[in-house]
Curated annotation (Swiss-Prot):
Localization annotation: Cytoplasm
Top-rank lineage group of the source organism: Bacteria
Active-site residues annotated for this sequence: E106
Name this polypeptide is given: DNA polymerase IV
GO cellular component, one term: cytosol
GO BP, sorted A to Z: DNA-templated DNA replication; error-prone translesion synthesis; SOS response
Similarity field: Belongs to the DNA polymerase type-Y family.
Organism the protein comes from: Dehalococcoides mccartyi (strain CBDB1)
InterPro entries, A to Z: DNA/RNA_pol_sf, DNA_pol_Y-fam_lit_finger_sf, DNA_pol_Y-fam_little_finger, DNA_polymerase-Y, DNApol_IV, PolY_HhH_motif, Rev_trsase/Diguanyl_cyclase, UmuC
Ranges in a coiled coil: none
Single annotated GO MF: DNA-directed DNA polymerase activity
Record-linked PANTHER family: DNA POLYMERASE KAPPA, DNA REPAIR POLYMERASE UMUC / TRANSFERASE FAMILY MEMBER
Top-tier EC class: transferase
Organism ancestry: Bacteria, Bacillati, Chloroflexota, Dehalococcoidia, Dehalococcoidales
Length: 390
């Protein structure tokens, strides 16, 4: 039986890193996202250059200005951050189908047994980090351990732009010397209370009798006691079912290359139909979204004659919608997205088209391989044109 391996991936200084990716002149400078310091606001994110001055998230902007007068203050662009977050999750889903997003900039991956695909889990983490840097222009840190809590703490030890793996069986010794403040779930008040009792490290917390800890912290005590030793059996939980499924990607360079756009559309269509089939559903509506170089965004949708869940039906419908938009506007394309909605259960068919049956069997085979080994473990002919992204 494989030893459990959980990966926690966190984008370094996410908001600021995105701003620096799209505005290279901000690189290596103290940058603060949150707005102008004259306002009554707080720091949403600070670059590592700004953090050297003691600036951190949640700090009043005016305080940050006093600490670092030369800092560059910017409003932030949450639509842009969401686009980057979607690209981030898309990359992660290529490595494992067991993905639990935690906000825009971090996620857990269940990677138990994936060594055979990548040589080692550490090499898998390196591949993920390289792809994020290459495709998004920002850095990520990764922690690997036998549980979610240990993996998250390992990520903090890896920052910035690094990775840290806790060997199986060494979780308790890894955590023991660390300050209790690093433990997720220990807030300022709990930290102060524990330290007033002389409990300042996770090792000391783990050594406390369960009865004593419960008398001080109540029902939360058993979790903290176990977590301090790296014991955390919580599963990686995928998001609950939504009423629509969509994928979109923002290109590094605006393009009108038809072959490239079709390949990207095919890739996105395969992603959403795989999710649809995993839910045992079919879709009645297909939608396409295109954003041009001037940020004009157009959407089109079509109601299908028959509900569908196959790659081919969804892609061909999306392709027709995409070409309709492109024929009406000659600008280069910045963003491409495809979505499906109005779900229903699979309908019983009195007559089965042999060709359609073969395609359904092919889709099922692809799904089975990808669910076990990750989405990028097998590629179709059209998406193979995008092999550089894998």
């Amino acid at each position: 039986m494989s030893i459990r391996r959980v990966m926690h991936v966190d984008l370094d200084a996410f908001f600021v890193s995105v701003e620096q990716a799209v505005r290279p002149e901000l690189k290596d400078k103290p940058v603060i996202v949150g707005g102008k310091p004259e306002r009554r606001g707080v720091v949403a994110a600070a670059s590592y250059e700004a953090r050297k001055f003691g600036i951190h998230s949640g700090m009043p902007l005016i305080t940050a200005k006093n600490l670092c007068p030369q800092a560059i203050f910017i409003e932030g662009n949450h639509q842009l951050y969401r686009e980057y977050s979607e690209k981030f999750m898309l990359i992660l889903s290529d490595f494992s189908p067991f993905l639990e997003p935690m906000g825009l900039d971090e996620a857990y991956l269940e990677v138990t047994g994936f060594e055979s695909l990548h040589g080692s889990i550490a090499e898998m983490a390196s591949k993920i980090r390289r792809r994020i840097t290459a495709e998004m222009g920002i850095n990520a840190s990764i922690g690997i351990a036998n549980s979610k809590v240990a993996a998250k703490i390992a990520t903090e030890r890896a920052k910035p732009n690094g990775q840290c793996e806790v060997p199986a069986g060494e979780e308790a010794s890894f955590l023991a010397p660390l300050d209790i403040a690093v433990m997720p779930g220990i807030g300022k008040k709990t930290e102060q209370h524990l330290k007033s009792l002389g409990i300042d490290t996770l090792g000391k917390l783990a050594a406390l009798p369960a009865s004593f800890l419960k008398s001080r912290l109540g029902a939360y005590a058993p979790y903290l006691s176990n977590a301090a030793m790296g014991i955390d059996n919580r599963p990686v939980e995928m998001p609950s079912e939504a009423k629509s499924i969509s994928r979109e990607t923002t290109f590094e360079t605006d393009t009108r290359n038809q072959t490239f756009l079709e390949a990207k559309l095919s890739y996105l269509s395969e992603k959403i139909t795989a999710t649809l089939r995993k839910r045992g559903k079919q879709a009645r509506v297909v939608q396409i979204k295109i954003r041009f170089a001037d940020f004009t965004t157009l959407t089109r949708q079509k109601h299908l004659g028959q509900p569908a869940s196959g790659n081919r039906e969804i892609f061909q419908t999306a392709l027709s919608l995409m070409n309709g938009i492109l024929d009406s506007d000659r600008q280069t394309v910045r963003l491409l997205g495809v979505g499906i909605s109005d779900f229903c259960g699979p309908e019983k068919q009195l007559e089965i088209d042999p060709a359609k049956a073969r395609l359904e069997k092919l889709d099922a085979s692809l799904d089975k391989i990808r669910q076990k080994y990750g989405f990028s473990s097998v590629q179709t002919g059209r998406t193979y044109r995008l092999k550089d992204m894998f």
